[in-house]
C-alpha cells in the first residue's frame, strides 16, 4: 500500500511539474529557454528510487509527456529513461548526500539527455543541424536546472529519502525461540 501511494505521489508531482513547466516557467524564461524539470525528476528517481521500478516509472512519465506536448512519441520517454539510468549508475560511485555531486550529475545528465533528444529529432524530423543554437539552449538549460537543484535540494532530498525508505523496507522478521 505504501508503494502504491508513493507511485501515485510521483505521478502527482509529475503533473505539478508539468504545470510549472508549461505555465510558470513559460513566463520566467532565460533568453527564451525553460528548465527541463522532468530530467531533474527522472535523475532524482534514479538516485533515490529502487532500480527495479525507476525505468518503468520514468518511461511511463516520458510517454505521458510525449502525449501531452510532443510531436514525436517516444523521445521524452527515451530521455527520461536515460536520465534515470544515469542516476542509477552514478549512485553506485558517488554519494547522494553531496549537493555538489548531485549538481555535477545533473549537468552531465541534462547535456546527455538533450543531446540524445536533439539527435533523435534530427533523425526523425529531418531538421537542419544548428550547433550554435543548440549549445546556447543547452548551456542556459544546464544553468537553469542547476540553480533549481541548488534551491530545491533540501526538499528533493527529504522526498527522496522518504521514497527510498518506502521502497527499501526491511523484510527481516526476527523469530524468538
PLM region descriptions:
Residues 1-177:
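Terminal, non-globular segments
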